[in-house]
């Protein structure tokens, strides 16, 4: 496929790539195949406490893409609420090992609108991102740095799903989602390393629609049919407003 398409990156996509029992074997195979092609090997959705330094060291000699970690929440309190099982110490250790392995680009995934979330939890996203950026400058000697560190903090919005522990939790409104995103952005702009942090968030309209589809009953079938009749098929519709489809 690489030879026929010209793709320059292979992504090992999973809810937790590091939990795949044959990860090391797969990475060894990909390294052998890609080492002369300068093809990126991307390892997203890594569970930081299970992140393999050995695997990271093996792929560092190939053209690097960014590493992706998913702290999910900015504070320890909220990570405990959602049973994430990660401490700030473990998160910073995982990031430090990545920096020592030669990476200077890290993506962080968080979620806004989680049950019991407070403004302090939201600001914690900015604070944790700043600490990770600071860890780069504290870990990597100036003469060994490959440019500035790049931290991309991305937030999606919490959508309660059936048959999950939070299935009865309330979902935020579009306006509440947007305000939380603005709060996060303002908090990041106040951080010491804010120039090293890029922030983006998921579209609020899409999250509201997903929540409706996730918990709707049989009556939602008529809505889906109507949307199809108005031209919606498998398009992401990211370039247009969702409101005109109502």
Language-model features: where?
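Class I SAM-binding transferase module
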Residues: 130, 137, 152, 182-186
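Conserved small/polar residues in nucleotide/adenosyl-binding loops
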Residues: 243-244
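Conserved SAM/AdoMet-binding glycine-rich loop
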Residues: 1-148
């Amino acid at each position: 496929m690489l030879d026929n398409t010209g793709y320059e990156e292979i992504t090992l996509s999973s809810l937790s790539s590091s939990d795949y029992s044959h990860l090391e074997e797969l990475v060894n195979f990909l390294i052998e195949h890609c080492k002369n092609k300068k093809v990126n090997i991307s390892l997203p959705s890594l569970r930081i406490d299970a992140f393999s330094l050995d695997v990271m060291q093996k792929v560092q000699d190939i053209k690097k893409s960014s590493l992706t970690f998913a702290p999910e929440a900015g504070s320890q309190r909220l990570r405990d609420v959602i049973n994430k099982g990660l401490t700030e110490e473990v998160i910073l250790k995982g990031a430090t090992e990545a920096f020592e392995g030669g990476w200077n680009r890290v993506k962080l995934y968080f979620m806004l609108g989680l049950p019991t979330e407070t403004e302090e939890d939201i600001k914690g996203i900015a604070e944790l991102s700043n600490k990770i950026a600071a860890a780069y400058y504290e870990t990597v000697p100036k003469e060994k740095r490959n440019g500035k560190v790049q931290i991309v903090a991305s937030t999606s919005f919490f959508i309660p799903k059936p048959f999950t522990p939070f299935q009865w939790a309330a979902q935020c409104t579009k306006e509440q989602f947007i305000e939380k995103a603005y709060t996060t952005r303002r908090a990041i702009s106040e951080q010491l390393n804010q120039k090293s942090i890029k922030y983006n968030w998921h579209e609020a309209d899409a999250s509201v629609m997903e929540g409706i589809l996730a918990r709707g009953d049989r009556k939602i079938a008529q809505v889906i049919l109507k949307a199809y009749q108005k031209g919606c098929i498998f398009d992401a519709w990211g370039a247009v407003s969702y409101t005109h489809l109502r």
